[in-house]
Amino acid sequence: TTLFVDGNHENFTRLNSLPIEEWHGGRVHKIREHVIHLMRGEMFDLDGKMIFTFGGARSHDIDGFATNSALKKDYTAGILQPDDPLIYEKLKILRTTNCCARIEEVSWWRSEMPTRLEMLHGLETLKAHNWKTDFIFSHDGPSSSLEILGGGLLSPDPLNQYLEKVKKKTSYN
């Protein structure tokens, strides 16, 4: 069986259209019988080991036609819209200037970043388990790890800050 948490390159439209099922104490999407998406903010009991899951991540390769200041205010500023009549011309320009081109609901989804509700659900799940788990499965990491691994080049986003809070409050069995 393959288990996974989502990251930032999943087709969230398709993933979130799947029925939600209970599995080993937490909510999942079953892609196939042996391919299972562990949803955000869930706790699973696998062979007596507790696993907290929290997927999601921000795409760091978005720039498009947005200015750096626009991207700092709203990282979605570099995303192209599929109904834009000039989309193919814009894509051509972006590709010739080595800019990453993403199209909403085609190659980029807003759902890549967790919502406040998902974050709250995760905190409530941990609280219900007395802030104890054996493992945390995530796609992204806490702010402190980002600083070390990113060499100071990456700025923490709300998910990194959330995972830092989880890291500080959680104890491991």
Question: Where do the PLM segments sit?
Answer:
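Core catalytic region of metal-dependent phosphoesterases/phosphodiesterases
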Residues: T1-L46, P156-D157, Y162-L163, K168-K169
